[in-house]
Regions:
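Conserved ABC ATPase "signature" region
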Residues: 97, 101, 108-125
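The feature captures the beta-strand-to-loop junction immediately N-terminal to the Walker
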Residues: 34-36
Length: 243
């Protein structure tokens, strides 16, 4: 999916959480959005997913303007927030079945779903209500739903700090990379620069609601630019830090 974020701003009261963010994201890309707490990362994802409406600007998916009422467009994306929302009494199998209905997908391959749940250490928990699961188990359950649905746009808020165990993070990275190879667009937020540098095809840095960096990573890996990026993040977190 082609994603165009065109001068998007978002205001809460008197505070601008986002100020004129413009980005063009191509199909097949994994995009890491970095920034300190309060930089605007989650607000940007909320606007992209239709959870919040921009105060100004627009978001286009494949050239069509998006808003929360565009249900057909919303069926082409899926969003995993920092703490996935889940019906307390629902279990994992019911969640996957609900996702398939909402996204109008055919019945999945049972063996492939079972293998995925086994890799996520969720297979013994398929009948457990979400209210009894840990945060990491909830995030892995939501990840399983996204993998099975396979939307055109995958959006993750802080998957690397979601409480998932190392295997869960490994499955996230593997499935996100496989999705990108299928032409999906993957966007995730993080504060972990080292992983983002190695995993993302593009890195965007937000600070106080503004876009400070938009860098294609592929041709820059191993060129020494990594230190420049780390220095930039440190300066944004500590304005007194000198170059």
């Amino acid at each position: 999916m082609n994603v165009q974020i065109d001068k998007v701003s978002k205001k809460f009261g008197r505070v601008w959480a986002l100020e004129e963010i413009s980005l063009d994201l191509a199909p097949g890309q994994i995009v890491g959005v970095l920034g300190a707490n309060g930089a605007g990362k989650t607000t940007l994802l909320n606007c992209m997913a239709g959870v919040a409406a921009p105060s100004a600007g627009r978001i286009l998916y494949d050239g069509e303007r998006f808003h929360r009422g565009k249900m057909e467009l919303r069926k082409r994306l899926m969003y995993l927030p920092d703490f996935p929302l889940a019906f307390a009494k629902m279990n994992l199998l019911e969640h996957i079945a609900m996702c398939m209905r909402l996204y109008e997908r055919p019945d999945p391959d049972v063996e492939k779903v079972a293998a995925l749940l086994e890799q996520l250490s969720l297979l013994p928990l398929t009948g457990m209500p979400f209210s009894a699961m840990s945060r990491g188990q909830l995030y892995k359950s939501a990840l399983a739903g996204m993998v099975v649905v396979d939307p055109e746009l995958w959006i993750f808020d802080e998957p690397l700090a979601s409480g998932m165990d190392p295997m869960g993070i490994a499955v996230f990275k593997r499935e996100a990379r496989a999705a990108a190879r299928r032409g999906r667009t993957v966007v995730f937020t993080t504060q972990i620069l080292e992983i983002a540098e190695k995993f993302a095809d593009r890195i965007c840095v937000l600070d106080h609601g503004g876009l400070r960096l938009n860098r294609q990573m592929g041709e820059r890996r191993g060129t020494g630019d990594e230190g420049d990026l780390e220095d930039l993040l440190l300066r944004l977190r500590d304005p007194e830090e000198k170059a």
